[in-house]
Amino acid sequence: LNSEEEALAKARAEGRPVIVDFWADWCTACKELDKIAWSHPAVREEAARFVAVKLDGSEETPAFQAAYEKYGIVGMPTVIFIDSSGKEHPERVMTAIGPDEMVKKLRAIQ
């Protein structure tokens, strides 16, 4: 998926939660998060029930900027979770975390 709107529409239609990952190619912590957490088998297994979209801020397109402002993002990485009812979960990931912590966060989202 290429946009936050596409992810939300798909999630609504399927009754699934959403992961929106704001990242950039110059962001060291974003790369760490990919390497340490997102690539881990346990995280991938738990994340499979989500509709996921990675929003690339490397070029700061208008679509990225609109989503960035909509969610009040202050830096990257920022990962937000939206539950299956469409509500944003109050806890965000704003640094590189390990797989155990990420699995715990994913399991908290219905």
Question: What spans do the regions from the language model cover?
Answer:
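Proteins that catalyze or organize thiol-disulfide redox chemistry
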Residues: 1-51, 55-110
